[in-house]
Structures are given as structure tokens and as C-alpha cells.
From Swiss-Prot:
It is found in: Periplasm. Residues 28-165 form the Thioredoxin domain. It comes from Bordetella avium (strain 197N). It holds the Pfam family DSBA. GO terms for molecular function: disulfide oxidoreductase activity. Disulfide bonds join 57-60. Involved in disulfide-bond formation. Acts by transferring its disulfide bond to other proteins. Belongs to the thioredoxin family. DsbA subfamily. PANTHER family: THIOL:DISULFIDE INTERCHANGE PROTEIN DSBA, THIOL:DISULFIDE INTERCHANGE PROTEIN DSBL. This is Thiol:disulfide interchange protein DsbA.
């Protein structure tokens, strides 16, 4: 059972995560923010699209199927990188969950986590609850436990936090494009579809600049 302090942290995180990213200033009429200076890429030779998300965020859950569909048709020189966000210490296990699933080669469970939390109302907020759930999905529990606390996963969590700070993310979902632009559903007219369309518009701009 979650302690009251952790429950309060997660409640605060859920509130933060449901707020679309709203930058302090951006060009009037634009559905994106220009990053200055541009941020370096972790994937040389590719245009990175960074999807900043939180499993506690219902907007992230809603847009994720659209992101998955978009990823199937994205240009060859574009790579999608999903970046789990922690707005407080109580959310770190959710970051670890994402990277553990990727390390165990179970990306299919990524969208199922959203459904478990938002659709089935499962409280996947600590290692035990997460381990029980992934075991029900056919994941070896011992492997999950070992990877969850591994140095590799901890390193990836640290990198996710660095990226969130560099992009000044204060709400989800948000999308970084080529290290040069940032967009979100709220910037794109409070529209999930609009955000996906804006990503497609920004990719050629990222190539050109």
C-alpha cells in the first residue's frame, strides 16, 4: 500500500502532467517554440523527435496511439525517442518502468501501461505493483526486478531528467523536434491531431536550419 506522502506526490504529479506545456513566450500565431540556442542530438545524422510524457498524464494516454501510428510512417532520417518525465521523486519508478520495459524488449507494454493506469485504474506506482503487473503480461519477474534497479536504467533516467531540464518541460505531452523546436497540443490549438501535424511541419524546418 502506498504511503500517504507518496500518494500526495503522485496526486501532485498527475495534476502537473495533465497541464499541456505552455511556454512563457512564443511567436504570435506559431504553434511551436524556437529553441535558442539549439540543443545537441543524441543521435548524430538523424532528426530526433523527443516525446516528453508521463504515465500519470491522461493527455499522454490519449495521444499515444496517434504517436504510434505516426512513428510507422515517419521519414527515414527521423528517430522517435520517448522521454518519461518525473515532476517529483514519487514519479521516478514510472521512469524506471519505461526503461525497464525497453531493456526487456517489451515495447508493446508501453501503451498497455497507459491503459492499465487510466483505463483499468491500476495503481502502478511502486516497484512491487509494477512487478506484479508485468508478470501478468508474461515478463519474467526476476529479470524485471534485476533490470529495474540496474545502472543502465538509472543512467537513462538521469538522461531523461537532463533532457527535461534542457527543454524546460513543465507539462506533458510535449515534443522536441531536431533540438530546435518544441510543440505541444496546446500550442497546436488544443489539438492532439494538430500537434502531430505540427511535428510533420517542423521536421523539414529542422533539416533546413
Amino acid at each position: 500500500m502506498l504511503s500517504s506522502s507518496i500518494s500526495r506526490l503522485l496526486a501532485a504529479a498527475a495534476l502537473a502532467a495533465t497541464t499541456f506545456f505552455a511556454p512563457a513566450s512564443h511567436a504570435e500565431g506559431n504553434a511551436y517554440v524556437t529553441l535558442s540556442p539549439a540543443l545537441p542530438s543524441d543521435t548524430p545524422g538523424k532528426i530526433e523527435v523527443l516525446e516528453f510524457f508521463a504515465y500519470t498524464c491522461p493527455h499522454c494516454a490519449a495521444i499515444e496511439p496517434m504517436v504510434e501510428d505516426w512513428a510507422k510512417t515517419k521519414p527515414e532520417d527521423v528517430v522517435l525517442k520517448q522521454v518519461p518525465i518525473a515532476f517529483n521523486a514519487g514519479m521516478k519508478p514510472l521512469q524506471q518502468l519505461y526503461y525497464t520495459l525497453m531493456a526487456l524488449d517489451r515495447p508493446d507494454l508501453h501503451i498497455k501501461v497507459f491503459n492499465a493506469i487510466h483505463g483499468e485504474r491500476k495503481r502502478l506506482f511502486d516497484k512491487k505493483a509494477m512487478g506484479d503487473w508485468v508478470a501478468s503480461q508474461g515478463v519474467d519477474r526476476a529479470k524485471f526486478d534485476a533490470v529495474f534497479d540496474s545502472f543502465s536504467v538509472q543512467t537513462q533516467v538521469q538522461r531523461a531528467n537532463q533532457l527535461a531540464e534542457a527543454y524546460r518541460i513543465d507539462g506533458t505531452p510535449s515534443f522536441g523536434v531536431g533540438g530546435k523546436f518544441l510543440t505541444s497540443p496546446v500550442l497546436a490549438g488544443n489539438s492532439y491531431e494538430g500537434a502531430i501535424k505540427e511535428i510533420n511541419k517542423l521536421i523539414p524546418m529542422a533539416r533546413a536550419k
